[in-house]
Regions:
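Hydrophobic (often cysteine-bearing) scaffold residues that line and stabilize catalytic clefts
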Residues: 27, 41, 60, 81, ...
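Active-site beta-loop-alpha junctions of metal-dependent nucleic acid enzymes
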Residues: 52, 75-98
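Short small-residue beta-strand/loop micro-motif enriched in glycine and branched aliphatics
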Residues: 70-74, 129-132, 155-158
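RNase H-like two-metal-ion nuclease catalytic core shared by retroviral integrases
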Residues: 17-20, 107-109, 115-116, 132-151, ...
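Mobile genetic element proteins and their domesticated derivatives, centered on retroelements
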Residues: 1, 31, 47, 63, ...
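C-terminal domain-tail junction helix/linker
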Residues: 123-125, 151-201
Length: 201
């Protein structure tokens, strides 16, 4: 593999976590491992993941639609702040103005999803909050699974450590565009997320 110029992407065992303890009461786990949806904007998942290179770190916040696995919105920042999470949700909410949908928004128990700003955004837009059970990673497995595949596919044959922060940001953005529009999935009948939504949504 070395002769062919192929570099193995080694996933780091330590995973970024925004959990800072039970800062406020958690809402019920409505999703409860059911990551299916019968229509677009019925059920959303959200999470933040860390991407590190030699020049520093970037944090990717996403909202993923359970109907077709599409990344509805995303934001990239140099810090995992509440603003990063809120801006991601605000961007997704803008797309609801063309519909009557009021999705469930499911997250882990991280601090970003328990601050007043996040709660106000969900309440003001009549979204239904759902949170994973304490210490139960599988409760948001669909979102975490996306990040795992992304870190493998996005940096296949490339070393993330060698990228600058600007290059890393471009890689992340380009991957999401490719994933939404071109990455076919067996679970979607050989269609990409956008193709599936346009045909069946």
């Amino acid at each position: 593999m070395k002769k062919e110029g192929i570099k193995i992407v080694k996933r780091k065992k330590k995973r970024f976590s925004s959990y800072l303890g039970e800062l406020s009461p958690a809402v019920p786990n409505i999703v409860n491992l059911d990551f299916s949806a019968s229509a677009p904007n019925e059920k959303w998942l959200t999470d933040i993941s860390e991407f590190a290179c030699s020049k520093g770190k970037l944090y990717l916040s996403i909202i993923r639609d359970c109907f077709n696995d599409e990344i509805v919105s995303y934001k990239i920042g140099d810090k995992p702040t509440a603003t990063l999470a809120n801006d991601t949700l605000t961007e997704a909410i803008k797309k609801l103005k063309r519909t009557d949908s009021r999705p469930i928004i499911h997250s882990d128990r991280g601090c970003h999803y328990r601050w007043p700003g996040w709660i106000s955004l969900t309440n003001d837009n009549k979204l239904i909050r759902s949170m994973s059970k304490k210490g139960c990673s599988p409760d948001n497995a669909a979102c975490e699974g996306f990040f795992g595949r992304m870190k493998t596919e996005c940096f296949y044959n490339h070393s993330i450590e060698e990228l600058s922060l600007d290059e890393l940001k471009t890689y992340l953005s380009n991957y999401i565009q490719w994933y939404n529009n071109d990455r076919i999935k067996n679970t979607l009948g050989g269609l990409s997320p956008v193709q599936y939504r346009l045909r069946f949504g």
